[in-house]
From Swiss-Prot:
Residues 157-168 have a biased composition (Low complexity). Disulfide bonds: none annotated. One of its GO terms (cellular component) is ribonucleoprotein complex. It comes from Herpetosiphon aurantiacus (strain ATCC 23779 / DSM 785 / 114-95). One of its GO terms (molecular function) is rRNA binding. SUPFAM superfamilies: L9 N-domain-like, Ribosomal protein L9 C-domain. This is Large ribosomal subunit protein bL9. NCBIfam families: L9.
Amino acid sequence: MKVLLIQDVEHLGTAGDIKEVSGGYGRNYLLPKKLAVFATPGLIKQAEERLAKQRKLEAKQREELRGLADSINGVTLKFVTKVGEQDRLYGSVTSSDIAEKLQAAIGQEVDRRKIQLDEPIKRTGVYSIGVRLLAGLEPHINVVVEGENGEGSVQPAAEAAEVASTEA
């Protein structure tokens, strides 16, 4: 029996998929729980058209994101903040701060959740941070954090992490 899934069904498929299932499974489980409907030729045709349209839309979005990745890759953002002892910042630089500066730099909005920052930056230095747009599409930006009036030494992120681990 062919059915068109209305909702995602674990171990079977996602909504919109057309699946071949046993008659008992379809009649006794999928149909009564409104998880699927009989796959008539008209429904199959509609599902295929919807799937083709969805693939076309995804391809277009992927191309737009590739263009965005090209504009993001290698951008350097500079943050100037107050610095205390041992190059520690008063406050921190968060993914939201980076997203705002990145939007100002490239003119397009980037969701802060896509910025791969494990924890806020709390020391001066140069950091390389990934922006995950899609699986396999992750451009990197450089973030430079300096103290006001040239306070604090700007060192690569690896050295900053090493200094932080020795002090902890």
